[in-house]
Amino acid sequence: MAFTAQQQLRAAELRQLLNRAAHAYYVLDAPEFEDAVYDRLYRELLDLEQQHPDLLSADSPTQRVGGPPAEGFSSVEHRIGMLSLDNAFNAEELQAWDARLGRQLEDNPERQREYVCELKIDGNALALSYADGVLVRAATRGDGSRGEEITANVRTIQAVPLRLQLKQPPAWVEVRGEAFIPDDTFEAINAERQQRGEALFANPRNACAGTLRQLDPKAVAARRLDFFAYTVHLPADEMGPKSQWDALQWLETAGFRVNPHRERTSGADGVVAFYDRWEEQRHQLPYATDGVVVKLDALERQQLAGFTQKAPRWAIALKYAAEEAPSRLLRLVAQVGRTGVVTPVAEFEAVPLAGTSVSRATLHNADRLEELDLHSGDTIVVRKAGEIIPEVLRVLPELRPEGAEQLELPSHCPECGSLLVRESGEAATRCVNSSCPAILRGALRHWVSRQAMDVDGLGGKLIEQLVDRGLVRSIADLYRLDAALLASLERMGEQSASNLIEALAASRQRPWHRLLYALGIHHIGSVNAKTLAAAFPSWEALQSASEEALNELYGIGPEISQSMQQWCSTEANQSLMAELAALELPLASDDSSAESAGAIGALTGQTLVLTGTLPNLSRLEAQALIEAAGGKVTGSVSKKTNYVVAGSEAGSKLQKAEKLGVAVIDEAELKALLS
């Protein structure tokens, strides 16, 4: 049945009224309507939508209650990477970061940098995408590059606006923030679970993460999650905030709940004063916090400071002091990693810390083990560094039992029996047997991981079976497995085996840069692997690359280039690459692949250097555009450089370009080249 114009107008009016009322209640804490009035208006809209389904819209408050259960979550790529933050754990580390940032910005030593301090909410990061003001996608952080699409679940969070409260919303905008569960809600959830005989959540963060991954949005709605927004990303051509402080005000204007406990301050001392105040008062808040997030205020200076591979240089998390607890040491275990490093791990009687039960902690290396002077049966003090990673802080020797033996790392590998080696000047003790089962298991786990070759269905337990039974002795052996053999293994059947064979076959189509990362070469992360693959589009090209050529690449220094050359020159690694080539794995870039690290385009064969701050593009965005057009971005200017792209406050690279006669262009000229 068609709806009338009057019904259409009434539905729009009801949506506007109800969304405004929800914002006033959940965000401003200033209710506009009595509950009975809200319920009557809500019922009227619901009846209209049920009678005329075509009136239903994505921003309707009736969509918050959740639709039918989902079959699963799809993986989505973040338009802008969701990086993590570096941490500081005391005032000295914060001051060192502030000084380092000043040097990177080439500030006068006396200059006090302007910072915005915000409470670090202990929840789960979300990215919310709005098209023409309407929420169209919500995703988890995931690995920073890709997350899970959980839009239906996030629509149930009342503090998340389904439509932005802006008269002229941008065509696209992404808002980031933290979903969390308030303390009283968390206690109520656990009380209900206890009554039903279900396992209790360890802490609100875990409860929030588990809730967001519920397949039934109605179950999510029942948990009453909350949300604070803290970042906005607008298109480059959109006039937006010029500072983090203004960005927070923009978010409030757009209808988001922003944490009120924030402060703009000058210098590290102001940051420390804010931190000290909230470390003392944090338990008075109705939700969990685990520190203070500090951001350089001016967005232009943020761009100038730039990013490392994992985190922005212009922001840091100053974490609260960790909780401590005494425990009794039970045993020392030597754990062998995928690179052969043997790590001492302390196992002790379980103690509650920061909302979870802790019974193991890494001791990192033999030096730390010797420094602690651990003996069997010792009483130790355990804490969680950053309230995440358990560590043994100290030993209480006065409580040591009589006759206790000093604990040391074994002289031989606990996995293969080979003599362990510790090179002069190195902290790490290693097993150097390339056939060690522990090294192989670690290498296989890394190879099949999502950011690497992404082989679905090949988990840790199955890898253990394959290695322990001698069915897989190298990465290459994975591609020699057959379905009949796999089906005979524990917890495997014909269908699971068939699915795994298909997943392995699909992994042969991964681009060259993914394979390069999957090899697990020391210092070669996913970002460096892309850089290397773009510059050297095949194994042969990379193998023959000189150290000088490697060092010219943006983000590649001597440590990385030496590690790469050492790996390439090792006979066992050369044999592995020959096997992978014979098995038709991607040892070269495929320009037809959407994920190809390189591309043929307007800048193919051209070398560019970026310097200064561009008016619209961040350095990472500019680099991505250049590489997508087939160009190469390096970190230094030479006679081989084709263009230097200069923004405001360009430094010595601009001077060197002028001296060498290298063409200097601005952002507009770069875009013209790209087109």
From Swiss-Prot:
Names of required cofactors? Mg(2+); Mn(2+)
Q: Which reactions appear under catalytic activity for this entry?
A: NAD(+) + (deoxyribonucleotide)n-3'-hydroxyl + 5'-phospho-(deoxyribonucleotide)m = (deoxyribonucleotide)n+m + AMP + beta-nicotinamide D-nucleotide
This protein's record includes keyword Ligase = yes
Q: Does the keyword Cell membrane apply?
A: no
Which catalytic residues are annotated? 120
Q: Identify one Gene Ontology CC term for this UniProt entry.
A: cytosol
Q: How is this protein named in the record?
A: DNA ligase
Origin species, per record, is Synechococcus sp. (strain RCC307)
Tell me what gene encodes this: ligA
